[in-house]
Amino acid sequence: MAHAVRALWPHGRALAWRLGDRPALGLHAQSRAGFTGAAGGSGPAATARKGGPRLLGAAALALGGALGLYHTARWHLRAQDLRAERSATQLSLSSRLQLTLYQYKTCPFCSKVRAFLDFHALPYQVVEVNPVRRAEIKFSSYRKVPIVMAQEGESLQQLNDSSVIISALKTYLVSGQPLADIITYYPPMKAVNDQGKEVTEFCNKYWLMLDEKEAQRMYGGKEARTEEMKWRQWADDWLVHLISPNVYRTPAEALASFDYIVKEGNFGTVEGAMAKYMGAAAMYFISKRLKRRHHLRDDVREDLYEAANKWVAAVGKDRPFMGGQKPNLADLAVYGVLRVMEGLEAFDDLMRHTHIQPWYLRVEKAIAEAPQ
């Protein structure tokens, strides 16, 4: 049960997000203690203590980089062939896909994927995974959610990791490449994280596999593309780690959070009752440990407010979204992460004490008005 309830909102083990503390494409989540990164960034002392795992991680990262270069080069060759094969009378790409999303509704990574699918009007079925038994994903050796099963004609593909799912599907929508080919550009690799545990990471996860013309048409320039990637990674590496310490900040907030989780999740009657009270108590104490791990302030609301205002400043006053006149993948990622707090005290405080509400409501409206 403890493992199940800890999977419902993110913490250090909720997803194999990254290898070590890779810098967020130029955007660092710098703490007051001088640590960089989101999940327990590595200071000098930590580096000395964890030299073995970090060396293994560095070696795996180097291998992953070589893999990424190989797959990127292979993509360029394949893209040339695909452009020659593509028909001017190509069927609507979205209508060729049948998608099934395996999720926990209250998971911010799953919420990110839903925001993407809804904004792009991609029809999909939802399977709510029981967080205790997880029988719904027993078919998969990859045991985290979200998982998307994508049927394209006779081809059935499994997509893992929220950012890979989004990047692969967006590449598909823009380029028309077969999804079976696209997913090979995001190869998984095993690595050892700072806690000495083996994790799965994916190469190129924030990169869309587009040719120059497609990239120019979508972004208009390299700066917009880099900005989108940077803030998508920031959402995964920093923003998401502020959720649990804030929604479980006090015993009352922890109980309210688990009341919401039980109502929205796929629990049995007994499991739900146990999760509500035992889970709330467990996560209240775990949230304190997460606060220390991520070097948050005593009042974790301050970190949440700071992150929200930092995002709003990055969007700026001259455009409604980071994507300009419509949300881009960074807008959808940040929105998806924050949305899981709706209905909770932390969300109300966030809307009241930061400048994020106008942007948040614009994204909400853009998703609601997406053509069906």
UniProtKB/Swiss-Prot annotation:
GO biological process: prostaglandin biosynthetic process
CDD domains cross-referenced by the UniProt entry: GST_C_mPGES2, GST_N_mPGES2
Catalytic function, reaction form: prostaglandin H2 = prostaglandin E2; prostaglandin H2 = (12S)-hydroxy-(5Z,8E,10E)-heptadecatrienoate + malonaldehyde
Site (Cleavage): 84-85
Pathway stated in the Swiss-Prot or TrEMBL entry: Lipid metabolism; prostaglandin biosynthesis
Regulation: Isomerase activity is increased by sulfhydril compounds. Dithiothreitol (DTT) is most effective, followed by glutathione (GSH) and 2-mercaptoethanol.
Binding site for glutathione: 145, 161-162
Residues bearing the modification Phosphoserine: 92
UniProt GO MF annotations: 12-hydroxyheptadecatrienoic acid synthase activity; glutathione binding; heme binding; lyase activity; prostaglandin-E synthase activity
Domain Glutaredoxin: 87-190
Function: Isomerase that catalyzes the conversion of PGH2 into the more stable prostaglandin E2 (PGE2) (in vitro). The biological function and the GSH-dependent property of PTGES2 is still under debate. In vivo, PTGES2 could form a complex with GSH and heme and would not participate in PGE2 synthesis but would catalyze the degradation of prostaglandin E2 H2 (PGH2) to 12(S)-hydroxy-5(Z),8(E),10(E)-heptadecatrienoic acid (HHT) and malondialdehyde (MDA).
PANTHER family: MICROSOMAL PROSTAGLANDIN E SYNTHASE-2, PROSTAGLANDIN E SYNTHASE 2
Subunit structure, as described in the record: May interact with CEBPB. Interacts with EXOSC10. Homodimer.
Name the UniProt record assigns to this protein: Prostaglandin E synthase 2
Organism: Bos taurus
Gene of this entry: PTGES2
